[in-house]
């Protein structure tokens, strides 16, 4: 079950973060320190932020796969996008491989998993009633060398999917 609150008074199988039109560039260093402490959609000027919970509402312990997919990109905006993912408070910053192919950008912890995936992971042994907290933050990194005029007006759509792979 997915929910925007810890008590999951309202639960869903699908959640949607708010859209930010005309996003301007910022530096990841300018993001608020408490960005993963606010539930639901909490966009700021220059970034999209969304916190939600995945709750095991069943009676069995389960393992699940998570993946963030790149569903649509225009104007090459993905070249300068950063995705910061907090899972239970642990932060990882993802970015596309440098244009010259020489690895990850210096402000990133990991490169995008592929041209169509930001990340993928497996969570083992989530017990009945337990919850995992996710915060997704997206911004245009102004210090990225690929953050140039040609990406102005570009759009990007991301999706995050969860799939149970095992129950005990």
Spans of features found by a protein language model:
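A signal for specific C-terminal beta-sheet/loop modules enriched in small/flexible residues
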Residues: 16-21, 25, 101, 105-114, ...
């Amino acid at each position: 079950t997915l929910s925007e609150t810890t008590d999951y008074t309202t639960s869903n199988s699908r959640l949607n973060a708010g859209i930010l039109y005309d996003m301007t560039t910022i530096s990841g260093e300018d993001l608020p320190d408490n960005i993963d402490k606010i539930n639901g959609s909490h966009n700021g000027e220059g970034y999209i932020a969304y916190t939600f919970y995945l709750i095991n509402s069943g009676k069995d312990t389960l393992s699940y796969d998570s993946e963030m997919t790149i569903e649509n990109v225009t104007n090459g905006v993905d070249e300068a996008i950063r995705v910061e993912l907090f899972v239970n408070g642990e932060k990882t910053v993802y970015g596309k491989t440098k244009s010259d192919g020489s690895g990850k950008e210096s402000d990133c912890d990991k490169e995008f998993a592929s041209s169509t995936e930001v990340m993928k992971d497996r969570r083992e042994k989530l017990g009945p009633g337990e919850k995992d907290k996710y915060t997704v933050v997206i911004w245009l990194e102004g210090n990225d060398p690929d953050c140039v005029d040609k990406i102005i007006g570009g759009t990007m759509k991301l999706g995050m999917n969860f799939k149970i792979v095992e129950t005990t």
